Amino acid sequence: MKAPTSTEQPATNEATTPPEIKTTFTSEEIQKLLPHRYPFLLVDKIIDYTPGKQAVGIKNVTINEPHFTGHFPDRPLMPGVLIVEAMAQVGGIVMTQLPNLEGGLFVFAGIDKVRFRRQVVPGDQLVMTVELLWIKQRRFGKMQARAEVDGQLAAEGELMFSLIN
């Protein structure tokens, strides 16, 4: 058997391997997908991602965040609206990864059935799971979101979004 010359290629398997599906995202990768920046980028990393379906993100809550200066000085609590925004940003990762929607800007179109079940304080790690329920005309959709701390439900609700040009 002769060795292949520099112009010959060794035989390869005709079947190609599908591209690897990314299931986690670092902070740097999130910044390439979402337009938010400090102090309004509220997702530190994505620890689990199922394309077109759901994402699980982490927010490490620290006393250094600017909202704790006034909410509240003697008893810092993460504002509920920021918990909802953090869940929406995790949902944004799901949306920006949908085929033909890469680079789209998604904004709130509505919020339903949001309930806060537990306080979120500095030192907590917020684990947010956001699942895409439906999308219509590739412009409007709804997601179910949950935020937990130490396995305890902190907030939940339905988030509606719209794609703007």
Curated annotation (Swiss-Prot):
Gene Ontology MF term list: (3R)-hydroxyacyl-[acyl-carrier-protein] dehydratase activity
Swiss-Prot/TrEMBL keywords: Cytoplasm, Lipid A biosynthesis, Lipid biosynthesis, Lipid metabolism, Lyase
Source organism superkingdom: Bacteria
Active site (UniProt): H71
Lipid biosynthesis recorded as keyword: yes
Statement: the UniProt record of this protein carries the keyword Coiled coil: no
InterPro entries according to UniProt: FabA_FabZ, FabZ, HotDog_dom_sf
CDD domains named among the record's database cross-references: FabZ
EC code: 4.2.1.59
Biased composition (Polar residues): 1-16
TM regions (residue ranges): none
Example GO biological process: fatty acid biosynthetic process
Reaction catalysed by this enzyme: a (3R)-hydroxyacyl-[ACP] = a (2E)-enoyl-[ACP] + H2O
Region (Disordered): 1-20
NCBIfam families attached to this UniProt entry: fabZ, PRK00006.1
Recorded family membership: Belongs to the thioester dehydratase family. FabZ subfamily.
The name this protein goes by in its record: 3-hydroxyacyl-[acyl-carrier-protein] dehydratase FabZ
Organism encoding this protein: Trichormus variabilis (strain ATCC 29413 / PCC 7937) (Anabaena variabilis)
